[in-house]
């Protein structure tokens, strides 16, 4: 059997890591050949028009489908570069050959104008509640931070694609990395879904859960320093509490908001309560993180499958997470999450719970659903790569 795996980019972020992992684990399956299609397969065209409808990408994909003749097509991301132009190409090939097609839902572009499920009332990034997806009033939610005209054009394009291309209908099964994504699709009437947890990096060496007795905790933030990541809001809460339960926050990463935060919280930096460590490679990062008591994940957008929760568990650390969107439910079975709401009382309660958690020497974290082996077995079953896996698929689908 031959599988064609498709993604916008070869290397960029988390979705690309999952793309490459899916290729590797499928190639390791007996009797399976794998071909790939991404940015390297055609001449890149710059500009917004190409992103809206990338005709060169569609023509290149049609040629690859004819040449490779796959029985399965697995798509990761397409709307950032390949564009919706490739969806009719896949649909036509399916109708002609009986091939089965699958989409891994790395973001929310099938259900809302903003793929991060964000709105911008008064310019402030705010997550859209899932129940709003079923209401017509979502049309009036500002989905872009770039102004009313850009927002209107974005919505017009989204509705045109939804009506004319119907991307959700082109795939036999939508693979959801989190229960929250599955629920979001269900709110828009999309039920052909199955859970497929993204795999965590195999480069990590598992460590025993860390214990700490101190009253004031040493926290670490990992990721892009951008508004939707919520670092500013978390630091505001911590500063308002005079860092009563927090000894320090170390920020690993970079981004467009870093300079602003360095100015805004200069007093915290001078006092040694806030430190910007910049970007580190994975090997150095996970060694450095082990020196902290816990990670903080303060995102103000819904997220989808924040693997930092799993990675923290693997190196023995708990995570203080903003109780919002997918963060509220993703990884609950692992046992290393402490939730907080965006107010001082909730943060204080969560920090007290975190201190108690860190003092429990017998605690254990379970990340078995996020291993490469589990991902490989589940993906093979969902793609029905053998008769046995096809028989086993029904009880596994959600």
Feature map (PLM): residue ranges:
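A conserved mid-protein helix/loop that constitutes part of the nucleotide-sugar donor-binding site
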Residues: 17-21, 217, 221-240, 256-260
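Membrane-proximal helix-turn-helix segments that form the acceptor-binding/catalytic region
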Residues: 109, 121-173, 183
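Carbohydrate-associated surface elements
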Residues: 180, 199
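Nucleotide-activated donor-binding/catalytic signature segment of Leloir-type glycosyltransferases, i.e.
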Residues: 262-280
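Acidic donor-binding loop of glycosyltransferase active sites
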Residues: 290-304
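Short hydrophobic beta-strand element within catalytic cores of glycosyltransferases
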Residues: 309, 318-321
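Conserved acidic donor-binding segment of nucleotide-sugar-dependent glycosyltransferases
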Residues: 336-345, 353-357
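A charged, aromatic-enriched C-terminal amphipathic alpha-helix characteristic of glycosyltransferases
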Residues: 358-390
């Amino acid at each position: 059997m031959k599988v064609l795996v498709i993604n916008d980019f070869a290397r960029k972020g988390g979705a690309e890591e999952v793309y490459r992992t899916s290729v590797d684990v499928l190639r390791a399956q007996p009797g399976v050949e794998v071909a790939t299609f991404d940015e390297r397969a055609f001449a890149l065209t710059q500009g917004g028009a190409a992103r809206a409808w990338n005709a060169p990408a569609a023509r290149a994909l049609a040629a690859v489908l004819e040449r490779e003749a796959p029985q399965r097509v697995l798509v990761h991301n397409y709307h950032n570069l390949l564009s919706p132009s490739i969806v009719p190409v896949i649909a036509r090939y399916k109708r002609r050959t009986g091939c089965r097609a699958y989409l891994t839902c790395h973001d929310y572009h099938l259900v809302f104008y903003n793929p991060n499920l964000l709105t911008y009332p008064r310019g402030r990034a705010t997550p859209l509640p899932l129940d709003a997806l079923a209401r017509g009033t979502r049309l009036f939610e500002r989905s872009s931070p770039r102004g009313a005209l850009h927002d209107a054009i974005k919505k017009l394009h989204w509705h045109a694609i939804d009506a004319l291309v119907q991307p959700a209908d082109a795939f036999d099964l939508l693979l959801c990395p989190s229960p929250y994504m599955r629920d979001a699709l269900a709110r828009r009437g999309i039920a052909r879904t199955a859970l497929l947890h993204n795999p965590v990096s195999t480069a990590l060496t598992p460590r025993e859960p860390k214990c700490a007795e101190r009253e004031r905790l040493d926290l670490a933030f990992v990721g892009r320093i951008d508004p939707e990541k919520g670092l500013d809001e978390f630091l505001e809460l911590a500063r308002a509490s005079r860092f009563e339960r927090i000894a320090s926050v170390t920020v690993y990463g970079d981004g467009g908001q870093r300079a602003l935060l360095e100015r805004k919280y200069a007093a915290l930096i001078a006092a040694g309560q806030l430190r910007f460590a910049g970007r580190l490679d994975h090997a150095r990062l996970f060694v450095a993180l082990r020196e902290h008591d816990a990670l903080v994940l303060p995102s103000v957008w819904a997220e989808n499958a924040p693997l930092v929760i799993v990675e923290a568990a693997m190196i023995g650390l708990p995570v203080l997470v903003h109780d919002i969107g997918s963060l509220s439910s993703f990884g609950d079975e692992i046992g290393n999450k402490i939730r907080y709401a965006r107010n001082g009382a909730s943060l204080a309660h969560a920090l007290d719970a975190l201190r108690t958690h860190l003092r429990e020497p017998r605690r254990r974290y379970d990340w078995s659903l996020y291993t490469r082996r589990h991902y490989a077995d589940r993906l093979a079953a969902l793609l029905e790569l053998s008769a046995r896996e096809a028989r086993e698929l029904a009880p596994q689908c959600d």
